[in-house]
Amino acid sequence: MRHPDFPVPPRIDAFASWEASLRLAFARRGGRTVLASCRHRGPLRVQKALYPEGEGVCHVVLLHPPAGIAGGDVLDIGIELGAEAHAVLTTPGATKWYKSPGRTAMQQVAIRLDAGARLDWLPQENIVFNQARPVIDLTLDLAPGAAAIGWDITMLGRHAAGESWQEGRIAMHTRLRCEGQPLWIESTAFDAQSPVLGATTGMAGFHVVGTLWAVGAGATEALAETLAEQLPYRDDLRAGVTCLTQDAPGRPSVLLLRVLARRPEDARALLSQTWLALREPIHGVAGRPLRLWAT
């Protein structure tokens, strides 16, 4: 059953062949962030809680043992961070979206942060196979005083294997909210023949796209301007950054960085570097490279 407090969108594929769900709850107990609750159904798991930064920050790796998502599959993830908790969540490798002519596969993630909670959401890239039809959905709801940094990276086609993305469709939906009120909402959907892939206002012929978002009191226009001075604009890697300020008092601003790349490694390296630079102004903690990715 879905947690009633998680704003998880309804399943859209009536022919789902494999459903998996995962529910995580983090809590602050004294000076320690703990994984207070973990429930799963189907092939979604987590490794044990790790503390490479000390007891205040809990690191967890999300595991999907099949290593790929096929047509009809639905992965349903709900995460809650209690007041003042700080969690870092990542994946051990790329998420592969397999060929599935005519059938949609879906991953939906709903995250809720209570007052003062801090989140680092750092999944590795999505790899969209030819003829895949993924729907990738993320909803993040923050209480006042909470902060979050996260990203998504998607590669269309398996170019290292000589396979381009010639057929299929992708839909990506992201909702960032504070107390249920929208801070930033983006919905993108196109097929493999869409002109957006080649348009200068779209992906400009690149096949890797990534977006980093940072939400919190430290997300300022001045910070965006500082980052902009260091971003590349080359034939193989391009990036830009902006800050969405909020009119309503008490609502956090959103810093957005977009990257286009030829290789997912380059996009991930740029977003990782940016994440390290953002941790101090957004979370008030030092940026440290993820040890999980070095093992």
Swiss-Prot record:
Keywords tagged on the record: Chaperone, Cytoplasm, Nickel insertion
Superkingdom, natural source: Bacteria
InterPro entries: UreD
Any one of the GO CC terms: cytoplasm
Any one GO molecular-function label of the UniProt entry: nickel cation binding
Protein's cellular compartments: Cytoplasm
UniProt family annotation: Belongs to the UreD family.
Protein's job: Required for maturation of urease via the functional incorporation of the urease nickel metallocenter.
HAMAP family: UreD
Record's subunit section: UreD, UreF and UreG form a complex that acts as a GTP-hydrolysis-dependent molecular chaperone, activating the urease apoprotein by helping to assemble the nickel containing metallocenter of UreC. The UreE protein probably delivers the nickel.
Protein name: Urease accessory protein UreD
Organism of this sequence: Ralstonia nicotianae (strain ATCC BAA-1114 / GMI1000)
Gene behind the chain: ureD
